[in-house]
Amino acid sequence: MNNKDLIFQKIIKRETSTHIIYQDKIVTAFEDIAPKAPIHIIVIPNIFIKTLNDINQKNKNIFAHMLYIAVKIAKNKKISEDGYKIVMNCNKNGGQEINYLHMHLLGGEKLKALY
């Protein structure tokens, strides 16, 4: 991991001023520092998983919990009825900029379809 990738570890340990909106033993969710929508939340596992390709039999429940928490946050933010987007990027060509598995929850306005 390089310094850019370590930022998520610092957020989990609350070593930054990042606004954490949810944290449990499995995941941490926080507001994106450069939001692409009125609501832009990042959900990460509390243990290091590099990419979607690294989800396996042992850690697949972590991924399911990430998705569950993203939906729970969407409901709490009152965007679940109007709609929201969950985005995950994998590796360089997939647009992943930080080498740490993370999920973007975007909403609060009409979002453009990717396809």
Swiss-Prot record:
Stretches assigned to coiled coil: none
Gene3D superfamilies attached to this UniProt entry: HIT-like
Alphabetized GO MF terms: catalytic activity
Record domain HIT: where: 7-115
PROSITE patterns registered for this protein in UniProt: HIT_1, HIT_2
SUPFAM superfamilies: HIT-like (SSF54197)
Listed name of the protein: Uncharacterized HIT-like protein BUsg_345
